[in-house]
Amino acid sequence: MADIFDYISRRGDLTFEQDGFNELDALVISRLSYLPFDGSVSSCLFDEITLEQAAMRVFATDDYEKNLLWKGDADLLKATAESKRFGKILVSGYVNEVESDVSMQFSAITFEFLKKNYFISYRGTDNSLVGWQEDFNMFFTFPLPSQKKALDYFEKAVRLLNGKFILGGHSKGGNLAVYAGAFTDENSRNHIDYIYNFDGPGFSLDKIRDSGFYEVDDRIYTFVPQSSIFGMMFEHEESYTIVKSNQKGFLQHDIYSWEIEQNSLVRLKSTTNFSVFFDHTLKEFVESLTIAQRREFTKEVFALLSLTETATFNEMLKNPLKNTGTILKSFAGLDSKTRNMLLKTIFAFVKSAKNNFSDITGGQKSIEITT
């Protein structure tokens, strides 16, 4: 079961002039945006350094490991930086912003892999409470603050760099890439070669119909694993490709579990019952709530989480008993109207899950979650 590390090992000795850009390169660079380049890569698009130099700076930082979002990220940075293919890529324009007052988490970085050929990589959701709250806000807010930032970042890059662009990202980062391509002006859109969305949510149809989506949809490449959850949220008007993960359920969101063959991801014909079940359940649940109810539920849930006085889920999990106790105590202390609203909403989700479980399994007691 080969993965992207095998790809880097096998093809890392070939430059982009020797072997052209492909979907695995897009996957690798999309993941690199999760690395903590703070203080290592300039926010200025003209202040470029090589990925090799950027990696040396990151690894020289004493506390870089605590800022890693996934255990494979440090290995990915090391492998790419040491390779001929990725190590000499020029990186610049690193932005990493978290604004709790508007529930926004946004990060992006630009890679120049060939002269005047750029890949803008948008980071997906990190482990901050703010980042996750923004994801929940997607069900009642459009556009999100991070979507606006993604568009501004791209249009600024076009004005300053005036080259050819590939936009891409994993998870929310993929959604940001598609948003930037769909909602930009015609001139900027003409600079786009491709857009890559790796297991990122789609959009409500009524939103994209008011955009330039259909002017760029033939350049969008969307990939989801067979039991995709996040990537199947909302609608994908563009066609999408189902790829094989060696993990199960939610863990398939991890791109390090995606299997490759030569220069491509391994294709499958369909998603699993698990993915269909969760997709139908979530859609039914969301549609059962008004916009106001969605907003109120999200507000109260994250208000409870904020009482733990932690900024990230990692911090919260360092003292699970204390923080769980804080949340439960705070929940019990809520006024009856708010408490009943939260319980009613949770029960609505359980009801949707029960209905869809029966519909999809045909009365069976289990559903398949792997292929």
Annotate each predicted stretch with a short phrase.
Residues M1-L24, V28-Y118, Y122-D152, K156-K164, ...:
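Alpha/beta hydrolase fold serine-hydrolase catalytic domain that processes acyl esters and thioesters
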Residues G168-G173, A177:
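Gly/Ala-rich beta-loop-alpha elbow adjacent to hydrolase catalytic centers
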Residues A177-E186:
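Short glycine-enriched nucleophile-adjacent loop
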